[in-house]
Amino acid sequence: MCGIIGYVGEGSCRDVLINGLDKLSYRGYDSAGIAFIKNSKINVVRSKGRIEKLKEKINDNFQKFEIGNIGIGHTRWATHGEPTEINAHPHLDAEGQFAVVQNGVIENYVQLKNYLTVNGTYFLSDTDAEVIPHLIAYKQKHLKLQIVEAILCALSELKGNFSTVIIARDMPDSIFVYQNKTALTLGKGSNFYSVSSDPIALIPYTKNFIQLHDRELGIISISQLAIYNKGKFTYPSRRFKANLNDLITNKASFDSYTLKEIHDQKKVLRNLIISTLQSEKSIDESGQLHLEYKKIKNFQIIACGSSFNAALVGKVILEKLIRIPVHVYYGSEFKTNLPPLLPCTLTIAVSQSGETGDMLSAIEIEKSRRKFQNTVYKPYLLSITNKNYSSITKKTAQSIDLKAGIEIGVAATKTFTAQTLSFYLLALKLAEHKFTLRKKEINKHLDEIRNLPKAIAHLLIKDESSIKWLSKQLKEISKCFYIGKGLNLGSALEGALKLKEISYIHCDGYAAGEIKHGPIALVENNTLIITITDPEQSQESTFASSQEAKARGAVLLAITHIEDSSIYQTFDFIIKIPKISQICASITSSVSLQLFAYYMAYYKGNDIDKPRNLAKSVTVE
């Protein structure tokens, strides 16, 4: 739950580190720092708060030429210890021999810290990361090891999913990089090597990337990468190129990345449709999927956060179009509450970042428990992610690339709708192979899908100003419930999550019929009830649930494309969405709810791109 950057090259590392930290800031952070080697000394600069404070501190204390050609940087999201300067990375050992940045969690740090403390080590911070430099220094001193040996010895004692980058005072031309189930990417340029937890930090400087493997120690210098694994050094040539167009972004004329990304959706979904639909009336394999369609008898979807809500919509779509059971599980729950092992099951792992810690663990467990089973229990693994170079794509046999471009805003917007559309396209592809829909029916669905970007564009042009006005009227609301049925339940849960994330208003989402089974006890004057409704989802009972809340003082807001006088008689406010098919309407409804949440947060003066206490990429379990 942090960002890592490292650089060793011919010029000063200052700009690479600072610019890299800036680009990593979208992942969420509460403090930042850098360490660099100059004149046989490791210098560390850290600060709490925004990276601008760190820049000021660096500029106040060092001229650019005073910052050497090797350094590491870090944006921290507090998991162990409060968000303070003393807890910020990088961390040093007592003698200043080693500086370390770390991402992830060291599970046995308490035991190691106690052991080192008993043996005379004094710790300054409350973090798990500070154990690493002290342990390396201890091993080097007491076991009389060389630097590389001491680092390897220390790393062998650390338990958990983490990555770490280390510089050593007495090896001022090398950076040590190590990962275990928390990814690091190396960048190769002209006369330099770099490392980061996300390629976005490296793209201004290189197009060539190298993925480190788990439990490998990489040593990078100006011109060379060496990998130490199983007792020997190798010099690998494995490389990949990231899609730079997907990684480069700016706010353009928008006030925030989040608002820009809401507006990006018409283009994102159009691109996803074009890349998936091969011709006018067929579904393209596009080289992405080669599933054994007819063998699939069950689905299980694993996801977290907004991806989980997209999975709930996906469940309804898949069951509706393919008529096969679909089970949806939280990634965080899957590993501790394993569901029954079902035969002929396609497991779909959904993750925006492709680096979610709970998701990666869940996939490993699913693969492991099916490994030695009868062939009917063979693991069919498919991922849906926005980063086709991420860890999740390496752990699944097949992957669907959302092609949404990088999403800077912490709250998911375009990736949520792209995930939902991906489920729809996947369902049609499976329906075509399993003959659960006639060709004519599939073509009708495809025609509706092709109209979706136009419907979203229409909504953004016609309705944004009215949604903005409505948000201003309702900004003092302190409690909110979202309700919907079927396809709209996932949209309701996602709408509630969006409002909660960026406006900090307490809200929850429920199945419309469930509000009377407990939640209505919380309804009082000025409680806002947002109802997502359409004629095909038991409109009358949804209206009845809304009216029951209104009788207890609630303010009612409807998201709908229904043209009916009963809507105006029942609801206090209405957000109209374009008339479109039921499945596509669940996506356009989500865009309306994103705009509503955005402007509620806007009128509260919140930092919408970086809401409090949230991180974009949750790499810890």
UniProtKB/Swiss-Prot annotation:
Gene Ontology molecular-function annotations: carbohydrate derivative binding; glutamine-fructose-6-phosphate transaminase (isomerizing) activity
> Taking every annotated instance into account, which residue ranges of this chain make up the domain Glutamine amidotransferase type-2?
2-223
Q: State the active site.
A: C2, K616
Q: Which GO terms fall under biological process for this protein?
A: carbohydrate metabolic process; fructose 6-phosphate metabolic process; protein N-linked glycosylation; UDP-N-acetylglucosamine metabolic process
PROSITE patterns associated with the record: GATASE_TYPE_2, SIS
Oligomeric form and interacting partners? Homodimer.
Q: What's the superkingdom here?
A: Eukaryota
* Every SIS domain range: 289-436, 470-611
Q: Which GO terms describe its cellular component?
A: chloroplast; cytosol
Record's Pfam families?
GATase_6, SIS
Q: What species does this protein belong to?
A: Cyanidium caldarium (Red alga)
Provide the protein's localization. Plastid, Chloroplast
Q: Which reaction does it catalyse?
A: D-fructose 6-phosphate + L-glutamine = D-glucosamine 6-phosphate + L-glutamate
Recorded hits in CDD domains, A to Z, give: GFAT (cd00714), SIS_GlmS_GlmD_1 (cd05008), SIS_GlmS_GlmD_2 (cd05009)
What is this protein called in UniProt? Glutamine--fructose-6-phosphate aminotransferase [isomerizing]
Which PANTHER family has this protein been placed in? GLUCOSAMINE--FRUCTOSE-6-PHOSPHATE AMINOTRANSFERASE, ISOMERIZING, GLUTAMINE--FRUCTOSE-6-PHOSPHATE TRANSAMINASE (ISOMERIZING)
Q: Which UniProt keywords apply?
A: Aminotransferase, Chloroplast, Glutamine amidotransferase, Plastid, Repeat, Transferase
**Known EC number(s)?**
2.6.1.16
InterPro entries documented for this protein: GATase_2_dom, GFAT, GFAT_N, GlmS/AgaS_SIS, GlmS/FrlB_SIS, Ntn_hydrolases_N, SIS_dom, SIS_dom_sf
Q: What does this protein do?
A: Catalyzes the first step in hexosamine metabolism, converting fructose-6P into glucosamine-6P using glutamine as a nitrogen source.
